[in-house]
Amino acid sequence: MAQSVPPGDIQTQPGTKIVFNAPYDDKHTYHIKVINSSARRIGYGIKTTNMKRLGVDPPCGVLDPKEAVFLAVSCDAFAFGQEDTNNDRITVEWTNTPDGAAKQFRREWFQGDGMVRRKNLPIEYNP
């Protein structure tokens, strides 16, 4: 059963943070790469701390072993310096898919008692 084995590692490019540069009066999009470096198929989901400012497309999916996906992280226009951006980040959550499951994302993979791993990518805003 896949859930008894902890999910393996993923890699992200960039590896530690996402940087957006001013001006912030227009929407910015930054692409990141998520790589399943484990030997098992995983399901992933992306969360953001500020859903009205930050978006991710696609927000979830399934990756086979060694497979990668590009995600578009977008930052909508906002009043820089007038809004709190200190805790902005995106979080990649992933878990092993059940053995024999179709390659189609299912939210319930994250709601059972299986192990879910997380990687936080803080957002940095350059003035």
Swiss-Prot record:
Question: What keywords appear on the UniProt entry?
Answer: Acetylation, Cell projection, Cytoplasm, Cytoskeleton
Tissues in which the UniProt entry reports expression: Sperm.
InterPro entries named among the record's database cross-references: Ig-like_fold (IPR013783), MSP_dom (IPR000535), Nematode_MSP (IPR051155), PapD-like_sf (IPR008962)
Which Pfam families does its entry note? Motile_Sperm (PF00635)
Gene3D superfamilies given in the database record: Immunoglobulins
Q: Transmembrane residues, as ranges?
A: none
Q: Which residues form the MSP domain?
A: 9-126
One Gene Ontology CC term in the entry: pseudopodium
Main localization is other
Q: Does the keyword Acetylation apply?
A: yes
Cellular localization per UniProt: Cell projection, Pseudopodium; Cytoplasm, Cytoskeleton
Instruction: Spell out which residues are annotated as carrying N-acetylalanine.
Output: 2
More about this protein: Around 30 MSP isoforms may exist in C.elegans.
**Function, as annotated:** Central component in molecular interactions underlying sperm crawling. Forms an extensive filament system that extends from sperm villipoda, along the leading edge of the pseudopod.
Q: Please state what the protein is called.
A: Major sperm protein 33
> Which gene is this protein's source?
msp-33
